[in-house]
């Protein structure tokens, strides 16, 4: 890398902190930016993220700042880890401070609010076509990643050298394996749609439908994910990898997933507001559901599971009626 700071991680939530810890544990000088000065002060004082990852101390090479200009200018390479609904806003904020050689990656999973555009398209529009871009995606829970448990993810980008550099930087033979993938579109789609299907898996379990129903939902959800991705030019093989099947299975089957827990609460009779309060963190799938609905309509792609989840979250349909609507669809070949 070209600077003393190997990477600036922008976003001090659970996942951003976990990625920063994983990198810094290898001895890499990493800078973690948070937007809240009080939170950053607590991180600096406690040398851990008491709110999200209280059992994982920060490595010595991990430093924190609330100064965005410093964080952006301190490293050639930036890793943005913020909720999808503020992704564009954060890029607008960092643009004035970017170096001539800045390269931008993100681990945000989702689509542009309201319009349902890929985050890569948002980044190109804001930062320019010439900036090297990359996206990280795959089956990763923050707590396990931060604790150094074995994890594998995928990375794709617009610039082969940047993708290779980021993969080498993040790869750790003891805990984190990073696979490069040429499918920049597919990795973005996988990370957004799996959140919606995970809500559905939680709903199914909350309704008491059992393992058969959950597995059918995951399997057909993968078909919907692939269908949307192919309409945008993605590679079908991507959806059998880390950012497709891998992330989908993880998010749909483990209660560390906020999206699954959100759906579980809804299936047990809680309102959207009550379920959100119960989770206490951003549930990306809630917004992703509307965004996927918009994108699927624009692409003229049929996504019946995602559509029923949209109707539950945004049109007041009961989970029971949504299940009946899916089961009552016309018979067809697999």
From Swiss-Prot:
GO terms for biological process: carbohydrate metabolic process; glycerol-3-phosphate biosynthetic process; glycerol-3-phosphate catabolic process; glycerophospholipid biosynthetic process. SUPFAM superfamilies: 6-phosphogluconate dehydrogenase C-terminal domain-like, NAD(P)-binding Rossmann-fold domains. GO terms for cellular component: cytosol. It catalyses: sn-glycerol 3-phosphate + NAD(+) = dihydroxyacetone phosphate + NADH + H(+); sn-glycerol 3-phosphate + NADP(+) = dihydroxyacetone phosphate + NADPH + H(+). Its EC number is 1.1.1.94. Sn-glycerol 3-phosphate binds at residues 109, 138, 140, 194, 247, 257-259. It comes from the Bacteria. The keyword Nucleotide-binding applies. It holds the Pfam family NAD_Gly3P_dh_C. NADPH binds at residues 14-15, 35, 109, 142, 258, 282, 284. InterPro entries: 6-PGluconate_DH-like_C_sf, 6PGD_dom2, G3P_DH_NAD-dep, G3P_DH_NAD-dep_C, G3P_DH_NAD-dep_N, NAD(P)-bd_dom_sf. Keywords: Cytoplasm, Lipid biosynthesis, Lipid metabolism, NAD, NADP, Nucleotide-binding, Oxidoreductase, Phospholipid biosynthesis, Phospholipid metabolism. Pathway: Membrane lipid metabolism; glycerophospholipid metabolism. The active site is at 194 (proton acceptor). Its main location: cytoplasm. Belongs to the NAD-dependent glycerol-3-phosphate dehydrogenase family. Catalyzes the reduction of the glycolytic intermediate dihydroxyacetone phosphate (DHAP) to sn-glycerol 3-phosphate (G3P), the key precursor for phospholipid synthesis. HAMAP family: NAD_Glyc3P_dehydrog. This is Glycerol-3-phosphate dehydrogenase [NAD(P)+]. It comes from Tolumonas auensis (strain DSM 9187 / NBRC 110442 / TA 4). The lineage of its organism: Bacteria, Pseudomonadati, Pseudomonadota, Gammaproteobacteria, Aeromonadales.
């Amino acid at each position: 890398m070209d600077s003393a700071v190997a990477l600036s991680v922008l976003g001090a939530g659970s996942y951003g902190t976990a990625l920063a810890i994983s990198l810094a544990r290898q001895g890499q000088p990493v800078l973690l930016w948070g937007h809240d000065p009080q939170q950053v002060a607590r991180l600096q004082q406690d040398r851990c993220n008491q709110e999200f990852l209280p059992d994982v101390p920060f490595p010595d090479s991990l430093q924190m700042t609330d100064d965005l200009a410093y964080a952006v200018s301190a490293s050639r390479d930036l890793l943005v880890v913020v909720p999808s609904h503020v992704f564009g806003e954060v890029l607008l904020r960092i643009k004035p401070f970017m170096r001539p050689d800045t390269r931008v990656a993100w681990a945000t999973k989702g689509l542009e609010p309201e319009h349902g555009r890929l985050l890569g398209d948002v980044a190109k529009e804001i930062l320019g076509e010439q900036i090297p871009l990359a996206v990280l995606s795959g089956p990763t829970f923050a707590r396990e990643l931060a604790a150094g448990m074995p994890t594998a993810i995928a990375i794709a980008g617009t610039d082969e050298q940047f993708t290779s550099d980021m993969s080498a930087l993040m790869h750790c033979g003891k805990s984190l394996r990073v696979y490069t993938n040429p499918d920049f579109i597919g990795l973005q789609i996988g990370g957004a749609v799996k959140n919606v299907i995970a809500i559905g898996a939680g709903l199914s379990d909350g309704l008491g439908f059992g393992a058969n129903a959950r597995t059918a939902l995951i399997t057909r959800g993968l078909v919907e994910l692939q269908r949307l991705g192919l309409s945008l030019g993605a590679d079908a093989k991507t959806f059998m990898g880390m950012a497709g099947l891998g992330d989908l299975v993880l998010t749909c089957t483990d209660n560390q997933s906020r999206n699954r827990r959100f759906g579980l609460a809804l299936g047990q009779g809680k309102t959207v507001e009550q379920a959100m309060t119960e989770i206490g963190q951003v549930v990306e799938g809630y917004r992703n559901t509307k965004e996927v609905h918009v994108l699927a309509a624009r692409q003229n792609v049929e996504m019946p599971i995602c559509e029923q989840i949209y109707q539950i979250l945004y049109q007041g349909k009961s989970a029971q009626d949504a299940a009946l609507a899916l089961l009552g669809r016309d018979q067809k070949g697999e």
